[in-house]
Swiss-Prot record:
Protein name per Swiss-Prot or TrEMBL: ABC transporter A family member 1
PROSITE patterns according to UniProt: ABC_TRANSPORTER_1, ABC_TRANSPORTER_2
Alphabetized GO MF terms: ABC-type transporter activity; ATP binding; ATP hydrolysis activity
Top-rank taxon: Eukaryota
Gene, per the UniProt record: ABCA1
UniProt KW keywords: ATP-binding, Membrane, Nucleotide-binding, Repeat, Transmembrane, Transmembrane helix, Transport
Length: 1882
């Protein structure tokens, strides 16, 4: 094997070539993420940014004074509580609390009327959340009042006063602005990225009354503390104080104002804030396509077994994965670079460009690893792409749950284990930092803006990559797989492999035993004991030298649900060098399992095999250095050239770099592909691909070649060329060949082994097996006319044991036993005499004796290898069926279980509907409208049916029968197809369920308690001033006193500054207007100081103080300027001031006030009503879920067209309209299930946006219309696909993008005023997509509820809400369905090139009945001039004259000058596929249609079946023209296509029932007709199995049965036995023979590549070459006319032990005759046997003597034939490798040959020489054909003036004993020889 580095480079080059050969797809992978970015950039450029100059922010709207204006005073609060009947709560229920209420009640008497005291905070919360909260009568003194707010004390002195102000979520007062929510205490405490001013927190604090309560409580604390500085105010001293006037106002903060900080100049970018919530999703959608492609690549190579093929050739597992990782890492690096370059000036203008690149690149790496991990679960690319893409998208959903500031950091990190979630969280950081014009940089990635820092997001994506990689590698080893070794789950932690190897080695039997020991176990009950031909001494020597493959007791057992199944049972087999072993066996015999174990794809259960001395268990790496495999299915890349394939595999096999090019060129030349070396594989024919696979197996000088059905699918001529190639390369190699072709096995196999039930039943040469198992010869005689009675007594007189096997038409066949060989000569002479007399008598016209034995011709054929196979392997005809039952994948088994249950229960869908009385009128109106629409559609259907079907469908019951049958077909298939069920029901349901669940699980915790303190400011500071600087105006005396007691920061004195705001006069005027002429200028001065001193401290400032002078009543007033980056800054600095005032008032510096903001918990009613579900996200989830449904609509449609099942239905009589209408109805009904589930989920999750009052009807209408519109639009898209897997993936992506991305883009554009008008215009085009209409309608409903729609849109049916979507969807349902019918009439690739007139002509043709999809190329009359100048054969001309003259008008079928020409292109001219074809087919005739691939057979059948339209000429079926009346002739035709056109999920019985209905079998006879066919084709035991579980043979049986259902008079069979093993093939032949020749009622047209099949079935055969009919006639007629030789195979008697011993003794005597030997020879002899005086010719063993080259030459001279040994040195012709080569190779490798081996070779050569001399003298003109060391083959001249059969048998039989002939056989030229003759001359 090649080095790891070279293998890695080869894999990278392969990946690179695969990418570059698909430039569009690769470009899309790279650019689609960029396109999403460009769309955002385009929107971004339309959004204008606003530049805000520096501003003081002092105006009427921003200056707030507590208790004035919109901020309610405490008396106003109490009055409002009284008016609404609500209460203000206090806790705990202590004396201090009651005293406070008593004192405050003196000043505010209404307080006692609205006060409710609770024992403690817990009792308060329990009451608030209880079910009876707020439930009371309208009587004022109700027991369960609503609580609007509460004051809860935690400490009540003497030094610390700690309390919480708790407000209700619905706190709002009539007459004040509607504050939708109270302060958010769960949000970030500080947001340094906030730009400008954010007045919302200030308004919330002031409007809600929080500051009012804070002022009242703090004033009371200051007042009460002044009464007793040491003790808290008690009830005792309070009672005495009540008699005096209390100093209420002393140090009381009576005037409190709040003003925001000034702001510097900034640019407001609303774009980032708008797209922030959807940015992560949009980015992710851009990566979906490259992710789907990566999953597809990973699984495709596994699905197509390419990966295992690479492993077989020596590729290391880790290199395979690493190559794909590097490939996509480079691709994502390029993509990330492009994204960075495109966004550096727009989306990420302020961020570090390297950080942007790192962000996208790390996500790309994690996506690669996630895709790899996902791919390990799948073996089918189609399923993997669909589910993998969904999984990838689903990994984003936790983002909706954790994207909340209240979610803990730990939960966000855990969610970030899903890389899409980590990616989306990172996008939030980008949006926040970009909006702040700061940008993300390496210096600030530690600071979080979304609760999790950008650094953590990057780190998690990197960690995810490593985690996914580890999991993927582990799962790839342990998950079940179709090929390769599956590791145990704990292989990482155990020494499993070491123990396994040792255990297996201990069980391996000794390899020194004979190949087939005498005590070999034979299964009980087998009809035959194993039979093996003996081997030569040279072969035994190979076993001793380790130059062969030795399989010993190889055993493989599979575990299944039904128990263990033995696939290979103690296999014993040896393969030798320079030989080809053909391994035969029925399907499931164990051949493929054996090969899989030999190449290392499967581990053996027990036993072992040594390949060139290396164990397959312990030394597989060494074996693969010499191993070349040509698998059954080509492991080729269509996008690579021949050279690139050979180069890649040469590197894997270790070919040196210096010789790589020459090795590749030589191998291409050796396999006959030198002229195609730079051709892409997809442009190669099937035969060329097999040659390339063969070259791949041979390259690197592979010594062991395994060929698994190397010629499958080839025509006979290409097959012969491949056989010659395989013969050519077998020298010096060990070749194992498996095949179903007996001719191939016989032609190539030096030895043939037959397996059955996992064991080897026999092994030997072809002639050995034939004579051991053969039944003799087949004699075929052709009578002069059908009425002539052939004298069978001629045959029986000579051979009484002869049996008649068939008599059809003019031919009769006899089976002659082998024992009758001596009688053949006399019998043939009498037959030839009768032939001569028949010719003489035919000249006398008046003699008409029907009893005269007139024989026109005769032929003889020997027992075929196929008959041997049938005797050995065909004894148990059910073996294939048993294997089908046993070897079923787990997926299949589960499917079968489901099918069983489906058959027991019928589908009974129920339509449930409900409505309330209020909507009754609306529903009634809609129902009437719906009935009108149905009537209109029905009328339209009637019109279309008249146009398409020729008459009204209402009067045609057959139309409805077809619709019903097709509907049942779709229903059954869909219900059993787990993928369809998953796509249509499970995936949408699960996706919708979990998506809504994630949104519902989005945390909505109770608002937490926060302490209003400066401790959170500047956390890096330490010491007393931990809160940072507090700018303080000390110009007022009281200010200096208060400043001394300030804590929570250090005082920064106000200084004069020269800074002025822009427009200073305007700023001053605003300040005076807002705060008055005294305070206004002072506030402006403070703001100017804040601006000028911005950079004087590295610590942030969050508040500053301006104090008024002390008021006359002793009260104080002050103004707090607060920083907008902290939403709690205002009340925090109020608390700082009040605590300082308390200390000043009491003179106690240890006293303080601590205020907390802790909103009350939501009430039970509020919790039910508060579904803070993001409506827009809900619409996205619904749209994504429903995007999978149209993909499920497309799959069965494209798949039916792909396997030609659709065409099979159309030619069986189905009309286009019935096909599409039944499909449409089923798809709509199936759509109702996920739609109903969606409605149920809407109710379950309380989505009032969709099912609330007035919203249910539009939601249901949109769902139903969406089902109709999306189905019909999907039908239109299906015409653009030829592969269902590609259709599923692309259509899924189309609906993803058209429905989701367009909706998101439209949503974003609609929110931005600058793009709103453009959005309204674009929506008219976007709505052409049903997905957009549906998602936009749902989003509009949801956004209407959120108040985000236009104010003009009040009703749900408004045009801009759901009206447009409902109208568009309804129209699209009809429009797209009509387009579908139009596309059916005109293929998509021709729509653009067709003019209206041509389309109309095609429509007229369709009206006349050409109801299938036309695939006819448009060709002008100029093609009529294309012709070929070739004279017709005389038989062909006679047939043509007979048809043209009208003599065949009464026949069932005749073709008349049928011609088909395909148009050319700019590179190639027109191609004539069929040229003037003329012949007829009679009733009871089986016409064989033979020809090479591309000869025109399938095209001819396509024209007869209506799939193609002739260019010129026509054909007549029962006198009806196939061009003029295509529909009329279909009822007479049964068609079996070349490839099974089956529905994989329908059972065998259901297939037959479907086509019985289609073909018009009456209902009451369908069961009988179907049962008859099941019995006739031996399918009764499979009747309830779905077709995908059938073997290839049973599938072909079903296809033929479908063609014969309804007993059509004409049956067309296109290669009906392809892929069958001989047992199944013989059964099929018998069925077809009964149909045609035996019943005499049906005409059969048969195409085949098997000449044996044509010989067995066809009464007449026509051979097509180049589109023309070259010959026609019965099989025997063709063989008699074109056959010019006999095939002779002779095997001499084996060399006996006596002969061998005597010959060795002669040579020993001569060798030890020392005086006569030269000294050099004596030296060699001493070396060979050692020097010992005791050694004599009598005591020396022959096996101890090794002959050197000189000794061999001397011995040959002594024996008198020195020339014979010269063949040991020079090579023989390349086309044949004889015994000489093996000895020659051993002689030069080992320096000598053992004497017994040389003796055996010499004696064998003597026998061959004698035979050759006899044959050359007895049969002049005989030519040598081949020799395999065991037998020789000759071609003998035969025919006019040549040898007769009687002469041939007579010569051989008379000289048989004299020449020592063990076995011989003579046969005539085969049909294959004649076929190859015509093919070679084409």
């Amino acid at each position: 094997m090649g080095s790891s580095k070279r293998q890695f480079k080869a894999m990278l080059r392969k990946n690179w070539l695969l990418k570059t050969r698909h430039p569009f797809v690769t470009s899309a992978e790279i650019l689609l993420p960029t396109i999403v970015m460009l769309l955002l950039i385009a929107v971004r450029t339309r959004v204008d940014t606003t530049i805000h100059p520096a501003h003081s922010n002092i105006d009427k709207d921003t200056v707030v004074e507590v208790g004035k204006g919109n901020s309610p005073s405490f008396p106003e609060v109490l009055k409002l509580l009284l008016a609404e009947g609500d209460f203000l709560a206090f806790a705990p229920d202590t004396d201090e609390t009651n005293n406070m209420i008593d004192i405050l009640s003196l000043k505010f008497p209404e307080l006692r009327l609205v006060t409710k005291i609770f024992k403690d905070d817990i009792e308060l919360e329990t009451y608030i959340t209880s079910a009876h909260y707020g439930v009371c009568s309208e009587v004022r003194n109700c027991s369960n009042p609503k609580i609007k707010g509460a004051v809860v004390f935690h400490e009540q002195g003497p030094h610390l006063f700690d309390y919480s102000i708790r407000l209700n979520h619905t706190w709002a007062f009539a007459g004040f602005p509607n504050v939708k929510s109270i302060m958010d205490t769960n949000g970030p405490y500080i947001n340094d990225l906030e730009m400008g001013i954010n007045t919302i927190p200030t308004m919330q604090y002031s409007f809600s009354g929080f500051l009012t309560l804070q002022q009242v409580v703090d004033s009371f604390i200051i007042f009460a503390s002044q009464q007793n500085n040491d003790l808290p105010l008690s009830h005792s001293n309070l009672s005495s104080a009540l008699r005096f006037e209390l100093p209420w106002t002393l140090f009381s903060p009576s005037v409190i104002r709040m003003v925001p900080f000034p702001t510097r100049e900034y640019t407001d970018d609303e774009f980032q804030s708008i797209v922030k919530s959807v940015m992560g999703l949009l980015y992710l959608l851009g990566f979906l396509f490259p992710i789907s492609r990566l999953i597809s690549y990973s699984v495709f190579e596994k699905e197509q077994k390419i990966r295992e093929g690479l492993y077989m050739m020596g590729l290391k597992d880790e290199i395979f994965h690493l190559s794909w990782f590097i490939t996509y890492a480079l691709q994502f690096a390029l993509c990330s670079g492009i994204i960075t370059a495109c966004t550096m000036g727009s989306l990420f203008k302020y961020s570090d460009k390297t950080l942007v690149f790192t962000y996208f690149f790390l996500f790309g790496l994690s996506a690669i690893m996630l895709s790899f991990m996902i791919s390990t679960f799948f073996t089918r690319a189609k399923t993997a792409v669909a589910v993998g893409t969904l999984t990838f998208l689903g990994a984003f959903f936790p983002y909706y749950t954790v994207n909340d500031e209240s979610v803990s950091m730990v939960l966000k990190v855990v969610a970030s284990l899903l890389s899409p979630t980590a990616f989306a969280l990172g996008s939030i950081n980008f949006a926040d930092y970009e909006r702040a014009h700061v940008g993300l940089r390496w210096s600030n990635i530690w600071r979080a803006s979304s609760g999790v820092s950008f650094f953590v997001c990057l780190l998690m994506m990197l960690l995810d990559s490593i985690l996914y990689c580890a999991l993927g590698l582990y799962l790839d080893k342990v998950l079940p797989r179709e090929n390769g070794v599956r590791y145990p789950w704990n292989f990482i932690f155990s020494k499993y492999f070491g123990r396994k190897k040792n255990n297996l080695q201990n069980r391996i039997p000794g390899f020194e035993t004979d190949m087939f020991p005498a005590d070999i176990e034979v299964n009980q009950g087998e009809p035959f004991d194993p039979v093996f031909e003996s081997i030569s001494l040279e072969m035994r020597q190979q076993e001793l030298d380790g130059r062969c493959i030795q399989v010993r007791n190889l055993h493989k057992v599979y575990a299944s649900r039904r128990g263990n199944c033995c696939a290979v049972n103690s296999l014993q087999l040896t393969l030798y060098e320079n030989q080809i072993l053909s391994l035969l066996g029925h399907n499931g015999a164990g051949k493929s399992t054996t090969i899989s174990m030999l190449v290392g794809l499967l581990p053996p259960t027990s036993g072992d095999a040594l390949i060139l001395g290396n164990s397959i268990i312990t030394n597989m790496d060494e074996i693969r250095k010499e191993l070349g495999v040509c698998p059954q299915h080509d492991i080729l890349f269509p996008e690579l050239t021949v050279r690139e394939h050979l180069e890649m595999f040469a590197v894997l096999k270790g070919v040196e770099e210096g010789s790589l090019k020459s090795t590749v060129v030589d191998m291409a030349e050796e396999v006959g592909l030198s002229d195609k070396i730079n051709t892409l594989v997809r442009a190669l024919s099937g035969g060329m691909k097999r040659k390339l696979s063969l070259g791949i197996a041979l390259i690197g000088n592979s010594k062991v070649i395994i060929l698994d059905e190397p010629t499958s699918g080839m025509d006979p001529y290409s097959m012969r060329l491949t056989w010659q190639l395989i013969k050519k390369i077998k020298k010096g190699r060990i070749i194992l060949l498996t095949t179903h072709s007996m001719d191939e096995a016989e032609e190539l196999g030096d030895r043939i082994g037959i397996m059955a039930n996992g064991s080897l039943k026999c092994c030997g040469s072809s002639i050995f097996l034939k004579h051991h198992y053969g039944v003799g010869y087949t004699l075929t005689l052709v009578k002069t006319s059908p009425t002539v009675s052939v004298a069978a007594h001629i045959v029986h007189r000579h051979i009484p044991s002869a049996t008649c096997v068939s008599e059809v038409g003019n031919e009769i066949s006899f089976k002659l036993p082998l024992a009758s060989l001596p009688c053949f000569e006399n019998m043939f002479r009498e037959i030839e005499s009768c032939m001569k007399n028949s010719v003489d008598r035919s000249k006398i016209s008046e003699i008409e004796d029907s009893d005269y034995p007139g024989i026109q011709s005769y032929g003889i054929s020997v027992t075929t290898l196929e008959e041997v196979f049938l005797r050995v392997a065909g004894c148990n005809l059910d073996i294939e069926d048993k294997q089908e039952d046993i070897f079923v994948s787990p997926d299949t088994k589960s499917s079968l279980v489901c099918i069983g249950s489906n058959q027991k229960s019928s589908m009974q869908p129920k339509l449930l509907a409900s409505c309330n009385d209020g909507a009754g009128v609306i529903i009634t109106s809609v129902a009437k409208a719906f009935r009108l629409i149905v009537a209109a559609v029905w009328t339209l259907i009637g019109f279309i049916s008249i146009q398409c079907c020729g008459c009204s469908i209402i009067s045609r019951s057959m139309f409805w029968r077809h619709c019903k049958a097709l509907f049942i077909k779709r229903a059954r298939s869909a219900c059993r197809d787990r993928k369809t069920v998953a796509f249509q029901f499970i995936i949408p349901a699960v996706f919708l369920l979990f998506g809504l669940l994630f949104l519902q699980l989005k945390p909505h915790p109770d608002q937490k308690s926060i302490t209003l303190t400066t401790a959170y400011f500047n956390p890096l500071l330490s010491g007393k001033g931990g809160g940072g600087p507090i700018p303080f105006d000390l110009s007022v005396p009281i200010a200096k006193e208060v400043a001394q007691y300030i804590e929570g920061g250090w005082i920064q004195p106000l200084r004069n500054t020269s800074y002025k705001f822009p427009n200073p006069k305007e700023a001053l005027a605003d300040a005076i207007d807002a705060a008055g002429p005294t305070l206004g200028p002072t506030l402006l001065s403070m703001s100017e100081f804040l601006m000028s001193s911005f950079d004087q401290s590295y610590q942030s400032r969050y508040g500053s103080i301006l104090m008024d002078g002390q008021h006359p009543d002793g009260s104080l007033g002050y103004t707090v300027l607060h920083n907008g980056t902290c939403q709690h800054a205002g009340p925090i600095y109020i608390n700082v001031m009040h605590a300082a005032i308390l200390r000043l008032a009491t003179g106690n510096k240890n006293m303080t006030i601590q205020t907390r903001n802790h909103p009350l918990p939501p009430t039970k009613t509020q919790r039910i009503q508060r579904h803070d579900l993001d409506a827009f996200s809900a619409a996205i989830i619904v749209n994504i879920a429903f995007s999978f449904i149209p993909a499920s609509f497309a799959v069965p449609i494209v798949k039916e067209r792909e396997v030609k099942a659709k065409h099979q239905q159309l030619i069986s009589g189905v009309s286009v309209l019935s096909y599409w209408l039944s499909t449409y109805v089923w798809d709509f009904i199936s759509f109702l299930f996920p739609s109903t589930f969606a409605i149920i989920l809407f109710y379950a999750f309380g989505l009032e946006q969709f099912i609330g009052i007035g919203r249910f009807l539009p939601t249901v209408l949109m769902l139903l219309e969406y089902g109709l519109a999306i189905a019909s639009s999907t039908y239109c898209l299906t015409f653009f696909f030829t592969e269902h897997s590609m259709a599923q993936n692309v259509i899924l992506m189309v609906h993803f993008f058209s429905g989701l991305i367009l909706m998101v883009i439209s949503f974003v554009m609609g929110l931005i005023p600058a793009t709103a008008s453009a959005n309204s215009y674009l929506k008219n085009f976007f709505r052409l997509s049903p997905g957009f209409c549906f998602s936009d309608g749902l989003a509009s409903l949801a956004l209407l509820r959120q108040g985000m729609k236009d104010k003009s849109s009040h009703g749900v049916f408004e045009w801009n809400v759901t009206g447009a979507s409902i109208c568009y969807l309804g129209l699209e349902s009809i429009f797209y369905f009509l387009v579908t019918l139009g596309l059916e009439l005109m293929p998509v690739q021709k729509v653009m090139s067709f003019s209206i007139g041509e389309w109309w002509q095609n429509l007229k043709a369709f009206k006349q009945g050409a109801g299938s999809s036309s695939t006819e190329p448009l060709l002008k009359d100029s093609t009529g001039a294309i012709s070929t100048d070739m004279e017709d054969d005389i038989d062909v001309q006679e047939e043509r004259d007979r048809v043209i003259s009208g003599l065949s008008d009464n026949t069932m079928l005749y073709l008349q000058n049928l011609r088909k020409v395909y148009p050319g292109d700019k590179h190639h001219g027109p191609k004539v596929a069929v040229q003037s074809l003329t012949f007829s087919v009679q009733a009871g005739e089986c016409f064989g249609f033979l020809g090479t691939n591309g000869a025109g057979k399938t095209t001819t059948l396509s024209m007869l079946s209506g799939e193609e339209t002739p260019t010129s000429g026509t054909a007549f079926i029962f006198g009806k023209d196939i061009v003029a009346s295509p529909k009329a002739i279909r009822q007479h035709i049964g068609y079996c296509p070349q490839f099974d056109a089956l529905f994989e999920y329908l059972t065998v019985k259901e297939h037959l029932e479907l086509y019985a209905r289609i073909k018009g079998v009456v209902d009451h006879r369908i069961d009988n007709v179907v049962t008859e066919k099941l019995v006739e084709f031996d399918l009764l035991k499979h009747s309830h199995k779905p077709s995908f579980t059938l073997s290839g043979g049973n599938k072909r049986k079903l296809s033929v049965a479908i063609a014969m259902i309804g007993d059509p008079p004409i049956v067309i069979l296109d290669e009906p036995s392809t892929g069958m093993d001989p047992v199944a093939k013989r059964f099929m032949w018998d069925v077809i023979s009964r149909l045609s020749t035996r019943s005499g009622k049906t005409a059969v047209i048969l195409t085949t590549h098997s000449m044996n099949e044509a010989q067995a079935l066809c009464t007449r055969i026509g051979i097509m070459v180049g589109g023309r009919l070259r010959c026609i006639g019965s099989p025997q007629h063709l063989k008699t006319r074109y056959g010019n030789h006999l095939e002779l195979e002779v095997k001499p008697n084996e060399v006996s032990n006596v002969e061998l011993e005597n010959f060795c003794q002669i040579i020993q005597q001569w060798l030890f005759n020392v005086p006569t030997q030269p000294r050099s020879l004596l030296g060699d002899l001493e070396v060979c046997i050692g020097v010992s005086d005791s050694i004599t010719p009598d005591t020396a063993s022959a096996s101890e003597i090794s002959l050197s080259p000189e000794m061999v030459q001397r011995i040959a001279k002594f024996l008198g034939n020195e020339q014979r040994v010269s063949t040991l040195v020079p090579p023989l012709p390349e086309e044949d490798v004889r015994f000489d080569d093996q000895l020659s190779e051993q002689l030069f490798r080992d320096g000598g040959i053992p004497l017994p081996i040389f003796a055996e070779w010499w004696l064998t050569k003597e026998k061959f020489s004698a035979l050759d001399s006899f044959i050359q003298s007895s049969f002049p003109g005989a030519t040598f054909k081949s020799c395999n060391g065991l037998s020789i083959k000759y071609q003998l001249p035969f025919g006019e003036g040549g040898l007769s059969l009687a002469d041939a048998f007579g010569h051989l039989e008379r000289n048989r004993n004299r020449l020592g002939i063990a076995e011989y056989s003579i046969s005539q030229s085969t049909l294959e020889t004649i076929f190859n003759h015509f093919a070679a001359n084409s």
